[in-house]
Amino acid sequence: GAFKGMDRFVARKAVAKVLDEAGLLVETKDLRNKVGRSERTDAVIEPRLSMQWFLKMADLVKPAIDGVKSKDITLHPPHTEKTYLYWMENIKDWCVSRQLWWGHQIPAWYDAEGNVVVCKTREEAVQALGTAQVSQDEDVMDTWFSSWLWPYSVFADNPEEEDYFYPTSTLVTGQDIIFFWVARMIMAGYEFKGKRPFKDVYFTGMVRDKKRRKMSKQLGNSPDPLDLIAQYGADGVRVGMLMTAPAGNDLLFDEDLCSQGSFFANKVWNAFRLVGMWETGADAMSASEALAVNWMRNRIGEALVELESSFTKYRLSEALMTTYKLVWDDFCSWYLEMVKPARGEKVSAEALEATKSIFNTL
């Protein structure tokens, strides 16, 4: 036609001109509207109807809903269950086709008349359509289509391992993909394997900056992890991140917490060096040493109960703080001060071995 090959914005004006010249244009006016743009190129997105492949979800969703409601699968923290059930109870059919250059190609085949069959291989399609002149659909699968099969597709080459590893115990992931990935894996597990893919799902929060903005390249508010590790050490960064990660809530990243984590790692290292410099004297512990050792062992026992409770409830930041206080306050600030020998004196061999044992436990 007359507009073929034109830039879309130029074509719009050309169409309006032709309509006007034909006396068919009633009115033109400016409208304020929300215009979608590509995240990568910022180009204006043009909505248009197209043929796509859909997966009917109504038959797949019920076992996945029942599995969570019956606690066959438990979501942590508890409020994520409400989000999950809302998505599942209002589910729409899944558009699984994508117009991309890469991915798993749609296994649909066409003959010259447009007849279509879905087959695993070209040979099966040729037989089904009764002609060698077949072409495969050029679309590829949505990336989540392969991902929802992940809990058991990884065992395709080693099926004997599936009985041991499937279902697995715990999945740790982000709340932003609760429907895109987690819900679909649950549906696939019940549909294709007849059982859940995992027992527990722990949802982490979103990492945000101190202004509560999502970390992104576009905003430039995301620090380079390698730079943080170079400055504070890997353990320092881990501790700093966990300090601000209450169960399931968003994580407000503050670099000062990585610094605090680094101080904690140094505290552990300095305590190790201190114990390594002790010289031994008598074999048996003194009464004061025995009192300190027994007290520290009792504190470890109490902390283990707290840790068991925190981990069972997936409260990882609380577990970290229990460990932090046990090491920094109880072990370093109290126990070592009670046991370490005065200048020029020695610690008993039994107390030193007990201290090393406590160190290993910590």
Predicted features, each with a name:
Residues 193-195, 269-284:
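Proline-centered turn/helix-capping motifs that create local helix->coil transitions or kinks
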Residues 42, 204-205, 268, 331:
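Residue-level signal for inorganic ion chemistry
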Residues 110, 134, 209, 242, ...:
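Acidic, turn-prone loop/beta-hairpin segments
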Residues 1-112, 213, 219-264, 269, ...:
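Residue patterns forming the tRNA-binding/recognition surfaces of aminoacyl-tRNA synthetases
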Residues 94, 98, 180, 185-189, ...:
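Short alpha-helical functional segments enriched in proximate histidine and acidic residues
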Residues 1, 99-249:
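Alpha-helical recognition segments enriched in aromatics with Gly/Pro capping
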Residues 147, 151-155, 210, 243-244, ...:
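A short secondary-structure junction motif
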